[in-house]
Amino acid sequence: MIEFDYSLDYKNIQFKPNDKRYRIGRGEQGVLLVRPYTNDICKHWRFKTHNEAVISSQKIFDMYLEYRIKKDFVGMDMCRKFLEMGFTRARRYANHKDGRTVSYTHLRAHETQF
C-alpha cells in the first residue's frame, strides 16, 4: 500500500476529483488535511449522541454516493475515512460517558504519588 504523503503542502492544495497527488494511506491517515473534502464533510460529522451519529453517518454516506456517481475517488475515500473515524469515536462515547479513554482525575492522583 502506498503510504499517505505528509510532505505535501496541504494548506495550499485544493484537491480535485481523482487528483494523482492523493494517497489513500492506512485507515484514517490524512482525514483532516485533504481540502476541500475535509471542509465539506467535516461540517456534517457528529457522533456524541446516538441520534447525532445516525444523522451524521447517513449524510456522509449520501455524500459518498454522490461522489460515486461523479466517479470522484478522492471524495469517496474521504467519506469512508470520516465514517471510519466517526465509528471509532462513537464507540468511545458508548464505552466512556465523556468520550475520554483515560480518567484525568485518576492521573492527577497518580502524579502526586511521585
Q: What residue ranges belong to the model's regions?
A:
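Short, charge-rich, low-complexity alpha-helical interaction segments
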Residues: F4-F47
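Short, charge-rich amphipathic alpha-helical segments embedded
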Residues: M78-R100
